[in-house]
């Protein structure tokens, strides 16, 4: 099964970036002039993703992109989604955690744990602080949880096409 993972920042001509520690949304003054027109967004959704008012798909709107991972867990637990599944990730950022400490924890400690116990873990210690799954690494966690079998990353056409973080 394929899951569409669509971040609205894809529809910007200038790609916003924030430090991982930032918990609040960027001020609209920072990006307000770079948002695609409604016509451009509709054209992309209808022509590239085959979405329309007549072809609706079930889903959820979330504020923090890492909430998608929580939604996927809910769908799996309710048997509405089976894993592993394929993700079509339409975003200005890859959300694979490079640039944060999670990749190091996942590689050095997490992957040594029994597979059955991995999904119970969503926090780790880094520099004497407890860190959790974030908007910048949730997709990496989904792969580590073995929820995701493949990722098709549709990078923002206005970006450098080399964003794997």
Model-identified regions with their sequence ranges:
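Conserved alpha-helical scaffold segments that buttress catalytic/binding sites
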Residues: 1-165
